[in-house]
């Protein structure tokens, strides 16, 4: 915070006026003048000065006496914080003095203009308890704050109010002396009500422990924002007009709950009927917002078979509009209760209450800037690292073959598939997002998307769950039970107020993390909802008059089974999945897993499965990889690594033991890399990627195959940055680029190879065309000739079969062949066994 004091002159509004003598001048900014009785003839329009009863005219004297007595209270803002009468023997005085000493010592660390503008001050709980100013006078300050939070926070607020008042009075006296004005009278300053916001409060309470015994206690909890309501004005004090005498009183409404006064403040008046004056200057309102927090599930807190718990939180004053759905926040506040259903007809529901949190401070993990550069500010989900964590991260980073260790630690239960695991590991680390906060440029996503397609039983779902478990922020959903609104965002209607509120879906909750989607092929129409989120990394909503955009900066890892239950290499990826090319082209890597018999591989796989079932899996809880037993001690690991391709380097050779990194520690390592490491491409790495991209473009033009666009080049750059970030390096080297080129070639090998194992570059990589394009072209050309000759573009199924027989077209399944033409838009099905040619 800025320790400089700014704005001490009249023009900055530091104080309003001062008295030049005991009887001279009136200070217009005093809050006590709000208690003066207004002119009844203007307020009600009914009474005049002649009609006013005599007992009303006598009420000025007690108020004037009270205003005079207030001057002898040493704390100017006592009435703003406490309802009871000031007493020198009050136990609160000692607390206020302790907090006053604390704020007086640290006043230079705070920006006074900012405190007065916001009406709040941030107080670090660790500084409060570690410093001697408070703990010497209040030894059990933590217990006092936990058990009596409202009184303790009011004491803090009054203490900073007193410190600022004295500071302003001192500067007012200096200004009077500089301008040669007399200093005979009392200087009056107007400091607003200041709320003390305590942050860094410990310990964090788990949401499952927040029960009835926490009512009235001060707690801190961390969770994900899943719903945010609109900002509304909440009335805390209401002006009421007495119907009998016309007296106006300001009646407090605790927690914003409406209630009527029981009696008139005038002693001789017995009026019991009151009218609310909402536009009166005595009516006080504040900004109010409600959010819903969902608990964060960690390893030791996961409970099978139950949905995550949620709790409502109320934000007031300067806390409103401090978070959006999907943010991870730490909230400190007071646990309170509210009626379950205000308008319920059932009498039993009147005894049912709901717990909610009245927020005192909120810390948004995403709102804090982690690093700035010329490309814009990168925002990250801030994690906390202990000294033990940092030593473990340093030990992991010091490994020679770190890529191999992380790949084999990702999912040790699944044998093989090293390059697929490498792609998933690169998605966990991710690349660097460019131009995130530059409004003059379109942001470029840095999160890669991975698709794993293959036969059932090869461990796709387990690798997917392992990736979501290792990610610092991972959301796992299953495609066959997911709706479009569950993936993106839901617009729900609040039952109490009738307003619309946003509820975040899986992609928004996985912001700056991983979203794993299993059974990707069974999602139905939900694929269209992913198109915007995968490329623009945001979700736009336009429903019920609400138009907004929410961030969804997440890496999507999807696993899919082919339609027929077995992957048919005679078809393309699109035909196997029945999925559009627009969605498939957004995936950086598409891996094809096939269950092909291999005697050596099957022998190793069976040994691996039996060892795991027998409990012989090595689970030593350290982060080191054992040195290669089969390798000569004089040979450097780097020399061996540089000679072998990546697929060989990642394999665990017989006789070698790998001690995998525990997932809890690997999650810390990934979080540290995403938070602090932002690599850039070196010149050599950029040249390798450029040469590979140009070679792909040359082949696609020469062979008339699927188009290679800049999406492939951006994918290469993203994955290369992730490869450097995996080893905590700020620069991506030539070796990183070569590894990524090998992974990309492996991914393309599965999509381009046909049923005979040959590389057919005329096949569409993303499957927008037919498996055998020339056969389809010949058949459609023949249909065009027949339609032009007969002036009829309607064909029966037996006519289509006869034309194919005349052309000597050999296909394995003719019905499937016609269905593919229907999917591609060449034929339109008009009825049972009736098709219309669309190319006329």
UniProtKB/Swiss-Prot annotation:
Its EC number is 3.6.4.12. It catalyses: ATP + H2O = ADP + phosphate + H(+). It comes from the Eukaryota. Belongs to the MCM family. Residues 30-40 have a biased composition (Basic and acidic residues). Induction: By E2F1. Pfam families: MCM (PF00493), MCM_lid (PF17855), MCM_OB (PF17207), WHD_MCM8 (PF25051). GO terms for biological process: DNA damage response; double-strand break repair via homologous recombination; female gamete generation; male gamete generation; mismatch repair involved in maintenance of fidelity involved in DNA-dependent DNA replication; protein localization to chromatin; protein stabilization; recombinational interstrand cross-link repair. Transmembrane segments: none annotated. Residues 402-609 form the MCM domain. This is DNA helicase MCM8. Residues 16-54 are annotated as: Disordered. ATP binds at residues 454-461. GO terms for molecular function: ATP binding; ATP hydrolysis activity; chromatin binding; enzyme binding; helicase activity; MutLbeta complex binding; MutSalpha complex binding; MutSbeta complex binding. The keyword DNA-binding applies. Component of the MCM8-MCM9 complex, a complex involved in the repair of double-stranded DNA breaks (DBSs) and DNA interstrand cross-links (ICLs) by homologous recombination (HR). Required for DNA resection by the MRE11-RAD50-NBN/NBS1 (MRN) complex by recruiting the MRN complex to the repair site and by promoting the complex nuclease activity. Probably by regulating the localization of the MNR complex, indirectly regulates the recruitment of downstream effector RAD51 to DNA damage sites including DBSs and ICLs. The MCM8-MCM9 complex is dispensable for DNA replication and S phase progression. It comes from Homo sapiens (Human). Keywords: ATP-binding, Cell cycle, Chromosome, Disease variant, DNA damage, DNA repair, DNA replication, DNA-binding, Helicase, Hydrolase, Nucleotide-binding, Nucleus, Phosphoprotein, Premature ovarian failure. It is an enzyme of class 3 (hydrolase).
């Amino acid at each position: 915070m800025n320790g400089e004091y700014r704005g001490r002159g009249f023009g900055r509004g530091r104080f309003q006026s001062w008295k030049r003598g005991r009887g001279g001048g009136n200070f217009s900014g005093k809050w006590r003048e709000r208690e003066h009785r207004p002119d009844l003839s203007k307020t009600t329009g009914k009474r005049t000065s002649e009609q006013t009863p005599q007992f009303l005219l006598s009420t000025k004297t007690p108020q004037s006496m009270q205003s005079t007595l207030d001057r002898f209270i040493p704390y100017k803002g006592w009435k703003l914080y406490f309802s009871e009468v000031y007493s020198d023997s009050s136990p609160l005085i000692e607390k206020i003095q302790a907090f006053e000493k604390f704020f007086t010592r640290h006043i230079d660390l705070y920006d006074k203009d900012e405190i007065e503008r916001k009406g709040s001050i941030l107080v670090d709980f660790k500084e409060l308890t570690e410093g001697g100013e408070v703990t010497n006078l209040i030894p059990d300050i933590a217990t006092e704050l936990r058990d009596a939070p409202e009184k303790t926070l009011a004491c803090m607020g009054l203490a900073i109010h007193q410190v600022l008042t004295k500071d302003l009075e001192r500067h007012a006296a200096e200004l009077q002396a500089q301008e040669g004005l007399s200093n005979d009278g009392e200087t009056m300053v107007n400091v607003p009500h200041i709320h003390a916001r305590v942050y860094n409060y410990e310990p964090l309470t788990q949401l499952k422990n927040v029960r009835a015994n926490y009512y009235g206690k001060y707690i801190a909890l961390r969770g994900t924002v899943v719903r945010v309501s609109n900002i509304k004005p909440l009335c805390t004090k209401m002006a009421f007009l007495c119907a009998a005498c016309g007296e106006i009183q300001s009646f407090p409404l605790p927690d914003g709950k409406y209630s009527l006064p029981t009696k008139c403040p005038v002693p001789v008046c017995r009026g019991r009927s009151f009218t609310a004056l909402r536009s009166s200057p005595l009516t006080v309102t504040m900004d109010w917002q409600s959010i819903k927090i969902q608990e964060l599930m960690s390893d030791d807190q996961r409970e099978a078979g139950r949905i995550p718990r949620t709790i409502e939180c109320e934000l007031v004053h300067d806390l409103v509009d401090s978070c959006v759905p999907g943010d991870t926040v730490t909230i400190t506040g007071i646990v309170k209760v509210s009626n379950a259903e205000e308008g319920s007809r059932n009498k039993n529901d009147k005894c049912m209450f709901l717990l909610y949190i009245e927020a005192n401070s909120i810390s948004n993990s995403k709102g804090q800037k982690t690093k700035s550069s010329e490309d814009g500010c990168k925002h990250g989900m801030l994690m906390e690292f202990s000294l033990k964590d940092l030593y473990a991260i340093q030990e992991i980073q010091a490994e020679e073959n770190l890529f191999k260790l992380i790949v084999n630690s990702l999912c040790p239960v699944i044998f093989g598939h090293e390059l697929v695991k490498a792609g998933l590991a690169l998605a966990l680390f991710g690349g660097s997002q460019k131009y995130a906060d530059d409004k003059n440029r379109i942001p470029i996503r840095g999160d890669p998307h991975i698709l794993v397609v293959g036969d059932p039983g090869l461990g796709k779902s387990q690798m997917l769950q392992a990736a979501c478990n290792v990610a610092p922020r991972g959301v796992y959903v299953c495609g066959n039970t997911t709706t479009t609104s569950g993936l993106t965002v839901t617009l729900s209607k609040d039952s109490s107020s009738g307003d619309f509120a946003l509820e975040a879906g899986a992609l928004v909750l996985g912001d700056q993390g991983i979203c794993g989607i299993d059974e990707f092929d069974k999602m139905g129409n939900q694929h269209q909802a992913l198109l915007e989120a995968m490329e623009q990394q945001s979700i736009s909503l336009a429903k019920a008059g609400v138009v907004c955009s929410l961030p969804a900066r997440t890496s999507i890892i999807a696993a899919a089974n082919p339609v027929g239950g077995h992957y048919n290499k005679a078809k393309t990826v699109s035909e196997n999945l029945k999925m559009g090319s627009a969605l498939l082209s957004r995936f950086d890597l598409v891996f094809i897993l096939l269950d092909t018999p291999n005697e050596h591989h099957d022998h190793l796989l069976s040994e691996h499965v039996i060892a795991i079932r027998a409990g012989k899996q090595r689970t030593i809880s350290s982060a080191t990889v054992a040195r290669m037993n089969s390798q000569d001690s004089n040979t450097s690991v780097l020399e061996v690594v540089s000679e072998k391709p990546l697929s060989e380097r990642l394999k665990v050779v017989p006789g070698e033991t790998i001690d995998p990194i525990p997932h809890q520690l690997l999650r810390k390592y990934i979080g540290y890399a995403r938070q602090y490491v932002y690599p850039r491409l070196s010149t050599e790495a950029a040249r390798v990627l450029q040469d590979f991209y140009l070679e792909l473009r040359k082949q696609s033009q020469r062979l008339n195959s699927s188009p290679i666009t800049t999406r492939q080049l951006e994918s290469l750059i993203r994955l290369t940055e992730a490869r450097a970030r995996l080893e905590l390096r700020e620069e991506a080297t030539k070796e990183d680029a070569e590894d990524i080129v090998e992974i990309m070639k492996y991914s393309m090998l599965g999509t381009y190879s046909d049923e005979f194992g040959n590389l057919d570059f005329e096949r569409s990589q993303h499957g927008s065309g037919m498996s055998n394009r020339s056969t389809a072209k010949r058949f459609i050309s023949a249909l065009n000739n027949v339609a032009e000759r007969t002036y009829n573009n309607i064909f029966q199924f037996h006519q289509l079969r006869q034309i194919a027989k005349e052309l000597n077209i050999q296909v394995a399944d003719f019905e499937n062949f016609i269905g593919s033409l229907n999917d591609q838009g060449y034929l339109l099905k008009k009825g049972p066994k009736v098709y219309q040619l669309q190319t006329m």
